[in-house]
Amino acid sequence: MDTAQKQRWAITLSYDGSRFYGWQKQAGGVPTVQAALETALARIAGESVATTVAGRTDTGVHAAAQVVHFDITAARPQQAWVRGVNAHLPEGIAVLHARQVAPGFHARFDAYGRHYRYLLESAPVRSPLLKNRAGWTHLKLDIEPMRRAAALLIGEQDFSSFRAAGCQAKSPVKTIYRTDLTQSAGLIRLDLHGNAFLHHMVRNIMGALVYVGSGRLSVEGFAALIQERSRLKAPPTFMPDGLYLTGVDYPGAYGIVRPQIPEWL
């Protein structure tokens, strides 16, 4: 059917990444977020639906506010794309908001900012209640040098030292607008706001910050690591469990509002 007859919708969804093998559809019926979402959307639309996501997430990585767009010919009310779709989604995924958008809107290319949070438990024994919800280290961490190191990430830089080997990004140069590191009740929260992120970038940053907090890497060493622009001397990639995509920024004209981070997170 002529694409001119189609409507473009944008939805914001949340999901528990520990239940899925990442965002992207895979062969062999492997459970992924995209496969589950497109199946549920098709049930409501009465036609096959292809989705485009703001940012793909790996196995075990969560989303508090992921954004997706899709095109459909079927006319459905807004609540059909929220309550209706949720009725057909498996546990671990929920559509939070839906909005019809301009035909030219693109969930990935129109995004000018992305927000991530890494939740880290620092304790001698890992809490079973936080498994799959937070990363963990048995090491006692000093948060002050970690804060100073994280602040060095701000600005436009070449982040090759925090880039996965298989990263498909055209350039390792990204801009970090803000970093924030807090600690309460044994949990450390790292918040990063940037224009875009490389594959495994946040997890690699957290791995290096854990080295800083434990004294295995100085703040000066962290600065040198950034300048090395190489993974060869960098600490290992940290576990995915504590990583959350918490928001995506779009121009106000699209009307897509970034929800607040849940209080429990």
UniProtKB/Swiss-Prot annotation:
It comes from the Bacteria. Its EC number is 5.4.99.12. It catalyses: uridine(38/39/40) in tRNA = pseudouridine(38/39/40) in tRNA. It is an enzyme of class 5 (isomerase). InterPro entries: PsdUridine_synth_cat_dom_sf, PsdUridine_synth_TruA, PsdUridine_synth_TruA_a/b_dom, PsdUridine_synth_TruA_C, TruA/RsuA/RluB/E/F_N. The active site is at 58 (nucleophile). GO terms for molecular function: RNA binding; tRNA pseudouridine(38-40) synthase activity. Transmembrane segments: none annotated. CDD domains: PseudoU_synth_EcTruA. Substrate binds at residue 116. GO terms for biological process: tRNA pseudouridine synthesis. It holds the Pfam family PseudoU_synth_1. Keywords: Isomerase, tRNA processing. Homodimer. Formation of pseudouridine at positions 38, 39 and 40 in the anticodon stem and loop of transfer RNAs. Belongs to the tRNA pseudouridine synthase TruA family. This is tRNA pseudouridine synthase A. It comes from Neisseria gonorrhoeae (strain NCCP11945).
